[in-house]
Curated annotation (Swiss-Prot):
The gene is folD. PANTHER family: C-1-TETRAHYDROFOLATE SYNTHASE, CYTOPLASMIC (PTHR48099:SF5), C-1-TETRAHYDROFOLATE SYNTHASE, CYTOPLASMIC-RELATED (PTHR48099). CDD domains: NAD_bind_m-THF_DH_Cyclohyd. This is Bifunctional protein FolD. It comes from Campylobacter jejuni (strain RM1221). Belongs to the tetrahydrofolate dehydrogenase/cyclohydrolase family. GO terms for cellular component: cytosol. Keywords: Amino-acid biosynthesis, Histidine biosynthesis, Hydrolase, Methionine biosynthesis, Multifunctional enzyme, NADP, One-carbon metabolism, Oxidoreductase, Purine biosynthesis.
Length: 282
């Protein structure tokens, strides 16, 4: 069994981005990511701090806009509009979840696609579905693909199962795997017999937010397992969606939690931001 070490790979990517940023600075461009946080959700605050720290580590300027819980939808839209027209800002990220009175889809669509470094804008989704690399790809699925590539895992002809059908992970992940030549099944909360799909899979990607959802009796020998889940137990321990101790015994490759997909997600956010800054140079 080989651990897919996202932490080590993300550190390598950050070093490469440092060099790219030094080159851009020599051309008068400083990569810049604007992060908007609405409200005081503790988890969201932690995520925003980690993103700002990661930016600093590889020479990306970060602007954090922390708005109060009562910020109106129009006020948020006005801020995004200002950032859309600011040539010194290359990426705009709105930290989710948003308060109930703000329409998430409207907000995400208001970010200009050329600065949508999360890859959620309909234009970028369209590029992905057409198999084009013109836009930005969603960070978590992109991170998974980079991790698989780094370990020289050939996806062509593989039977892949994705558990979870969100627009953030499951759906774009399915498209990327299809584009790479895999045969893809997407399972979700209404799938009748999950094991029916997972037992025949060469590759399983779990992104459901459910502790121990994937157990060893549900997988075949030699399976490749990617655990996107992040769950905090009452003890404070962070675990994924996979019964790691048991499933790892049957796996050829598996990601740990933490230290697998999480660091790659942030690395891809940074990579997309630098890509946007480079686009400005071109």
């Amino acid at each position: 069994m080989t651990l897919l070490d996202g932490k080590a790979l993300s550190a390598k990517i950050k070093e490469e981005l440092k060099e790219k940023n030094q080159f851009l600075k020599s051309k008068g461009i400083e990569s810049c990511l604007a992060v908007i946080l609405v409200g005081d959700d503790p988890a969201s605050q932690t995520y925003v701090k980690s993103k700002a720290k990661a930016c600093e580590e590889c020479g990306i300027k970060s602007l954090v806009y922390h708005l109060n819980e009562n910020t109106t939808q129009n006020e948020l839209l006005a801020l995004i509009n200002t950032l859309n027209h600011d040539d010194s800002v290359h990426g705009i990220l709105v930290q989710l979840p948003l308060p109930d009175h703000i329409c998430k889809d409207l907000i995400l669509e208001s970010i200009i696609s050329s600065k949508d470094v999360d890859g959620f804008h309909p234009i970028n989704v369209g590029y992905l579905n057409l198999g084009l690399e013109s836009g930005f790809l969603p960070c978590t699925p992109l991170g998974v693909m980079k991790l698989l590539k780094a370990y020289e895992i050939d996806l062509e002809g593989k039977d892949a199962v994705i558990i979870g059908a969100s627009n953030i992970v499951g759906r774009p992940m399915a498209t990327m795997l299809l584009n790479a030549g895999a045969t893809v099944s997407v399972c979700h909360i209404k799938t009748k017999d999950l094991s029916l799909y997972t037992r025949q899979a060469d590759l399983i990607i779990v992104a459901a937010g459910c502790v121990n959802l994937l157990r060893s009796d549900m997988v075949k020998e030699g399976v490749i397992v990617i655990d996107v889940g992040i769950n905090r137990l009452e003890s404070g321990k962070i675990v994924g969606d996979v019964d790691f101790e048991e499933v790892s015994k049957k796996s050829s490759y598996i990601t740990p939690v933490p230290g697998g997909v999480g660091p790659m997600t942030i690395a891809m956010l940074l990579e997309n931001t630098v890509k946007s800054a480079k686009n400005r140079l071109n």
